[in-house]
A protein has these predicted regions:
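S-adenosylmethionine/decaboxylated-SAM
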Residues: 1-148
Length: 148
């Protein structure tokens, strides 16, 4: 969820199983050409399904379940994205959320909606019995969740 230039998508594609696919979502239409260029050059274009639009509208329409979900998008919607995907993640599946420490802003009184949402997300996943969670304090913070 959140493609930007597609670097993370390509890295994830390198670890796919033989018949695996990746669905990637971004709402920035201006980045589609850049993403396509990199996906073609990488050799993984045929296993990557690009979706353009708001993730909250696209996720319900993607078929199947997920082994891994990487969230690196609009911080305000991290709690919503978790709610939309959690029941579709396979047992033992992994959810990775980037930027969860938000330059240390989550440790202070929140002054913006993104920080409030990340604080809410961090509490939500910490207290959710469906997942085991750990925050890795590298760079801007990375949450790893494993579905029980």
């Amino acid at each position: 969820i959140g493609t930007y230039t597609g670097y993370s998508t390509i890295c994830l594609a390198e670890g796919l199983t033989k018949n695996g696919t990746i669905d990637t979502i971004d709402e920035n239409e201006e980045l589609i050409e850049i993403q396509n260029k990199f996906f073609c050059e990488s050799g993984y274009f045929n296993v990557i399904n690009q979706h353009l639009g708001k993730a909250k509208n696209i996720i319900p329409n993607i078929r199947g379940t997920f082994d891994l979900v990487f969230i690196d998008a609009d911080k305000e919607n991290y709690p919503l994205y978790f709610d939309l995907i959690i029941n579709r993640v396979n047992k033992g599946g992994i959810i990775i959320a980037d930027n969860v420490l938000w330059s240390g802003k989550v440790l202070k009184k929140p002054k913006d909606e993104a920080t409030k949402a990340l604080i809410n997300f961090n509490r939500l996943v910490k207290n959710d019995s469906r997942v085991e969670s750990i925050i890795l304090p590298v760079r801007d913070g990375l949450t790893l969740l494993r579905k029980n």
